[in-house]
UniProtKB/Swiss-Prot annotation:
Coiled-coil parts of chain: 414-441
InterPro entries: Znf_C3HC4_RING-type, Znf_RING, Znf_RING/FYVE/PHD, Znf_RING_CS
Name assigned to this protein: Putative RING finger protein ORF9
MF terms (GO), sorted A to Z: zinc ion binding
Species per Swiss-Prot/TrEMBL record: Ostreid herpesvirus 1 (isolate France)
Keywords per UniProt: Coiled coil, Metal-binding, Zinc, Zinc-finger
Start-end of RING-type zinc fingers: 12-49
Pfam families: zf-C3HC4 (PF00097)
Keyword Metal-binding assigned: yes
Source species, domain of life: Viruses
Length: 592
């Protein structure tokens, strides 16, 4: 009895009728004739006893079509080897000229990275909707004289800026040409081959063409994201009626995820060369506008802003200085040195005050508030939270006074934001950005109990005297600060009693500002702390070299050795580890 669907001579496995015209297949792959298939009392296969329900009786039952393809299958099985070999040869011949000759060890292209729309807020306050498409462009190598089909990425952007009518509604198209990179590094060189900006307002298209003067960078590809680092800025000049308006694409490095869940500014600290920065020390008769890009010099968090800084120098007491990786202004007033940065936005209507690491700072050098952030704070975001200067006459109109004494006086008199308002703003921001909880910036001072609440668990504190007496332990931060004041020392050391491996975690709390600012989050107690003051120096007393890979969740900058932050972040860039930066008057910690 031949009952299988794959048999050459089909017969019904129930009535044994041969030469069936209509064959229905049951789940066990045995064949039955149409009359037997529709009989209501028959629901088991007589061969293997498998139950089935006819599709006519149950519309949800699987429809097994009765195809009689035994002869076709046999013919295919006999000739399968010959046909497969012929198809493979034809496929290789057809695809060979279209396959890009890219070494997979040098570059790994992202997959399915086409038509991904991602909403992104740049540090300049522009809203960008990215649409990336990928193609291939032939490139001739000078040494090998061969044509390589290198990836060509085109980025379509829609730029919106509520504060600048010129940028409103413009479409930006950027094309990047990828060239070869170092083997195994994952990075390859790239250059801008095409940049165009078109005004697409509803009132009618107004084509605006721009010329690209330069732009060479590096691109790193992975299967899920594309990262681009711009090594030189792209000055773009308008050739239309907007000839007076010049601007730069100052996004040096961006990271795009396929799903669009993570998109934030990122920067490598050492891609700018020193020759791009020159100090401004020449005497000036009045305010002068200086174009610069201010970004963070710590932790790889970029804050690339197109800003205008007012510079003025009177009797060698005030000067504007641009140093290496950051922009700083030192004001000497009565022997007291204050280090602030006054940056004016591109529209020239408002000031923004930044500290040296690119975070908005409000207050004096002893007290202040640093806003937590998920993305790098933009001028538009900062302007929405609070205003820096108190009196508007300092920033509007021709009577604007840009002297630093007046600005600092207004700045010192400015009342700080109330603690309840700051907490409410922080909690609201945390609720809206739960997935970025590890990318926070926190600031604590002596009276921080109401900020801490139940979120932060302080383990223990201890205070040491100058004469190295036995330290007193306490779990109350206020008591620890009182002990510090009583003993007359400016250094309070905190120690977690939890031992991890063969080390104990030590955290240095700075109290030199007189306020007793401190930090120690309980959720960081699961890792080790790398305190630079605890490193064993060399025999000659010099600072030791840092290890190649720092696998410590917390890095603390001490006063014993002067380490450049770039030396540390180089080893932690692309790693989900915490970095703690100790300044003279406040502490920050954030996630790279």
């Amino acid at each position: 009895m031949a009952c299988s669907k794959m048999s050459v001579d089909l017969e019904c496995c129930i009535c044994l009728e041969e030469d069936i015209e209509r064959v229905d297949t049951i789940p066990c792959q045995h064949t039955v004739c149409r009359p037997c298939y529709l009989k209501p009392m028959i629901n088991k296969c007589p061969v293997c006893r498998v139950r089935w329900i006819a599709r006519e009786r149950d519309p949800l039952a699987k429809d097994y079509t009765g195809e009689h393809y035994a002869h076709t299958y046999g013919f295919f099985a006999v000739n399968i080897d010959e046909e497969s070999e012929e198809e493979e040869e034809e496929q290789v011949i057809e695809e060979e000229p279209q396959t890009p000759e890219i070494d997979p060890e040098e570059i790994e292209l992202p997959r399915r990275f086409v038509d991904e729309r991602i909403e992104y807020f740049l540090a300049t306050g522009l809203r960008i909707d990215y649409v990336l498409t990928r193609g291939y462009c032939p490139s001739i190598q000078a040494d090998e004289q061969e044509v390589l089909y290198l990836p060509l990425y085109t980025i379509y952007c829609n730029a919106y800026d509520a504060n600048d009518d010129i940028l409103h509604g413009q479409e930006i198209e950027i094309t990047i040409q990828i060239t070869r990179g170092e083997c195994g590094s994952g990075w390859c060189e790239a250059q801008f081959v095409y940049v165009s900006i078109t005004d697409s307002e509803d009132s009618g298209p107004k084509p605006i063409t721009h010329s690209v003067k330069g732009g060479i960078g590096a691109v790193r590809f992975s299967r899920e994201e594309i990262e681009f680092e711009l090594q030189t800025p792209l000055p773009i000049e308008s050739r239309t009626s907007y000839s007076h308006f010049e601007w730069e694409i100052t996004t040096p490095y961006f990271k795009i995820n396929q799903t669009g869940e993570e998109l934030y500014p990122w920067a490598v600290l050492d891609f700018y060369e020193e020759e791009f920065w020159e100090p401004i020390v020449e005497p000036l008769d009045g305010p002068v506008d200086v174009d610069m890009s201010s970004y963070s010099a710590i932790g790889g968090i970029a804050s690339m802003l197109r800003v205008t800084a007012a510079a003025r120098r009177d009797n060698d007491e005030q000067y504007n200085e641009i140093i290496g990786r950051h922009v700083s202004r030192k004001v000497l007033n009565g022997g007291a040195e204050k280090d602030y940065i006054y940056l004016r936005e591109i529209n020239g209507k408002e000031f923004s005050i930044y500290d040296k690491i690119g975070n908005c700072f409000v207050g004096t050098n002893k007290t202040g508030i640093t806003l937590p952030f998920t993305h790098v704070p933009s001028p538009a975001a900062i302007r929405g939270n609070h205003h820096i200067l108190k009196e508007p006459e300092y920033i509007y109109g021709e009577e604007r006074d840009t002297s630093y004494e007046t600005a600092l006086q207004s700045f010192d008199d400015w009342e700080l934001i109330k603690r309840e308002e700051l907490l409410q703003r922080r909690y609201k921001r945390e609720e809206q950005n739960l997935k970025y909880t590890s990318n926070r910036l926190f600031y604590f001072e002596k009276e921080f109990e109401e900020i801490m609440e139940d979120k932060w668990a302080i383990e223990s504190y201890m205070c040491e005297d100058d004469d190295n007496t036995k330290p007193e332990y306490t779990t109350d931060m206020r008591v620890a600060c009182e002990q510090r004041d009583r003993h007359g020392t400016d250094i309070v050391k905190c120690r977690l009693d939890k031992e991890v491996g063969s080390r104990r975690m030590h955290t240095l709390i700075d109290g030199e500002s007189g306020v007793g600012k401190s930090f120690l989050a309980g959720h960081l107690s699961r890792g080790l702390v790398f305190d630079l003051d605890w490193i064993t120096p060399n025999e000659d007393g010099s600072k030791p070299e840092l290890p190649e890979d720092l696998h410590y969740p917390i890095i603390i900058l001490g006063k014993r050795f002067d380490y450049d932050m770039r030396e540390i972040t180089k080893r932690l860039l692309y790693k989900k580890e915490y970095v703690v930066v100790k300044l003279s008057y406040m502490y920050f910690f954030y996630c790279i």
